[in-house]
UniProtKB/Swiss-Prot annotation:
Belongs to the UPF0329 family. Residues 325-360, 370-389 are annotated as: Disordered. It comes from Encephalitozoon cuniculi (strain GB-M1) (Microsporidian parasite). Residues 345-360 have a biased composition (Acidic residues). This is UPF0329 protein ECU06_1620. Residues 329-338 have a biased composition (Basic residues).
Length: 579
């Protein structure tokens, strides 16, 4: 890193509690030439989401906790954006730049924060629209000499010129030449920062990112959005710099460093779908600096293939509808048309051919980023697990479950009423999930949150996003799988399995391996009272069906006396693809 980079540092704001630049905590990063900082229109607190791009202020008012996380940020939003995008000159034993900022920019930014926040709080704008408005107000370039920021930039360059001309007299001739070179480089970098085209690009790129984030949130189903946020929870740049403790105290914005020229060119050439996918990949953890023309072409080709597959699927459905209409019309006319075997075979082969073609043309990609191997492989590539008695117990009748829990030492379940056991059976009697867990596709659905130690044993935790439908209730949440290693075989034993109802706002905390509610079992009973999962069967009279789709895994429990009646349905969502 050279001296120029050392002096030009952007301060990313975390714990902004007032409208001044005096912050309790901050983090610094280098902004190099040809790069811009884009800010995502999400407010985070720790790993959790506090405000979505689509959130209006009226939505926040209904949730006091979200208001508490976001209000300090609103009142200081302009200073935060300034710190992300421009920053300032730091020079030891000389506060001239700090004084210049206080005189020329402090009030300007304070007014913008106040005015834009009032409009957002009283109006009908979304948070992404609010962020766009802040950028436009700060970096407006339509006035004389390019606006207030450009004029301030000219003043900064004058001060730098003064530093170049007035080198400290005690310096030697060689040190004076170094002083001149240093401040000459700083002047060039300042000219770049306050270039009118760069400021226009700042506004344009931020609008592009805000629009894409809003479309992502509106276009995804709730469980898909939760999967996106779950996948990206550990891949936050600012949070990583500050650590969990600091990032958990106040609301903060996340950022990416990108080449604005490349992003703008991609948007003009390929349109909004490719831009949206690029932004989604950054939310999943793709580094903005890694997005080059080659990567953009790869994403564009993937989007084209996705659209072709969608068109083929629509065409296939239309053909089926037309065939169904013809059959219905034939029955109505009283003409019984028998479909000969060759026609049926032709229809089947057509479907198989389309599906095979789709499979062959799927671009190579990873599911959810780098995949960790979970479980011990058995023959045929399937993973081997054992089931602890505290998990297999839930397959029994509520009466039997209560009887067994009352005999156990685990305080959490002992003494529960029969009604409570019946309610909890819906969330815990999901052993059909283990079929997916031991399959080769497990990593496409489950996120390995990492290992941790509790009660003297090493434990692991797998989490998948899902939707549980029981009766008239439809619940969004996660499927949790807690494991420990069997000794001496090393085979994972599933000691915890349940569906946990979870909202989007809490998904970050729930994804943590040390999530308190999931791991409140201090000591695991390792008395060998568990069975090999390959031998697991549901008791007689229980009917359930597994439905495998490209983007989901579904377990359907039916009434054994009436197969048309669905008692419960659990759908596990596939992890988003990292390109």
């Amino acid at each position: 890193m050279n001296q120029r980079d050392t002096l030009w540092i952007l301060t990313a704001v975390l714990n902004a509690t007032n409208c001044s630049m005096q912050l309790e905590h901050s983090s610094s990063f280098i902004l190099r030439p040809n790069n811009q900082v884009v800010v995502f229109p999400f407010i985070f607190r720790g790993c959790n989401i506090a405000v979505l791009p689509t959130a209006k202020h009226s939505d926040l008012r209904r949730n006091p906790k979200r208001m508490e996380d976001s209000e300090p940020l609103f009142c200081n939003i302009s200073h935060i954006i300034w710190s992300f995008t421009i920053g300032g000159v730091a020079y030891k034993d000389d506060d001239r730049f700090k004084r210049l900022f206080s005189e020329r920019m402090e009030g300007y930014l304070k007014d913008i924060s106040s005015n834009t926040s009032k409009v957002y709080m009283k109006g009908n704008k979304t948070f992404s629209e609010f962020l766009e408005a802040v950028y436009k107000r700060i970096f407006q370039c339509d006035g004389k000499r390019g606006g207030h920021v450009m004029r301030y930039g000219e003043d900064v360059m004058k001060e730098i010129g003064g530093m170049m001309e007035n080198a400290p007299p005690e310096l030697s001739e060689e040190e004076k030449r170094q002083h001149q070179r240093l401040w000459g480089n700083i002047k060039k970098y300042t000219e770049y920062l306050y270039n009118i085209e760069r400021l226009k690009h700042l506004i344009e790129v931020e609008k592009m990112v805000c629009d894409a984030c809003k479309e992502i949130c509106l276009g995804l189903r709730e469980e898909e959005l939760m999967g996106l946020l779950a996948e990206g929870r550990m891949r936050k740049s600012l949070k990583m710099k500050l650590g969990d403790e600091e990032a958990g105290k106040k609301g903060y914005l996340e950022y990416a460093i990108v080449n604005d020229e490349i992003l703008l060119d991609a948007h003009r050439e390929y349109g909004g779908e490719v831009t949206k996918e690029l932004v989604m990949q950054m939310l999943l953890g793709k580094k903005g600096e890694e997005i080059d023309k080659r990567y953009i072409n790869k994403v564009a080709n993937m989007i084209k293939e996705r659209q072709r597959r969608r068109e083929r699927e629509i065409e296939k459905r239309v053909k089926k509808l037309l065939r169904d209409e013809e059959k219905a019309k034939g029955r109505k006319d009283g003409k019984k048309k028998s479909v000969n075997v060759s026609e049926v075979k032709e229809e089947e082969s057509e479907t198989e051919e389309v599906e095979a073609g789709e499979e062959a043309e799927m671009p190579s990609m990873e599911i959810g980023g780098a995949r960790r191997k979970t479980g011990k492989k058995s023959r045929g590539g399937r993973k081997r697990y054992k089931i602890h008695k505290r998990v297999s117990r839930w397959r029994k009748s509520p009466e039997k479950i209560k009887e067994e829990w009352d005999r156990e030492s685990e305080e959490r379940w002992r003494g529960r009423s029969l009604e409570e056991i019946k309610e909890q059976k819906v969330f815990h009697d999901i052993a059909g999930v283990l079929e997916l867990l031991r399959s080769e596709d497990a990593d496409k659905f489950f996120i390995d949150t990492g290992e941790y130690t509790k009660g003297g044993s090493s434990r692991g935790r797998l989490v998948a996003i899902g939707v549980l439908e029981s009766g008239e209730k439809k619940m969004l949440g996660v499927v949790e799988v807690g494991t420990f290693k069997d000794s001496p075989s090393g085979c994972p034993v599933v000691y915890h399995l349940m569906f946990r109802v979870t909202g989007i706002e809490e998904i970050g905390s729930v994804m943590s391996p040390e999530f308190a509610e999931a791991n409140d079992i201090e000591k695991i009973d390792e008395d060998k009272e568990y069975q090999d999962m390959g031998k697991f069967v549901y008791p007689k009279g229980t009917e359930y069906e597994i439905v495998r789709r490209e983007q989901s895994f579904q377990i359907v429990w039916g009434n054994p006396f009436d197969t048309s009646e669905v008692l419960c349905r659990l759908t596990i969502q596939c992890r988003p693809c990292v390109i």
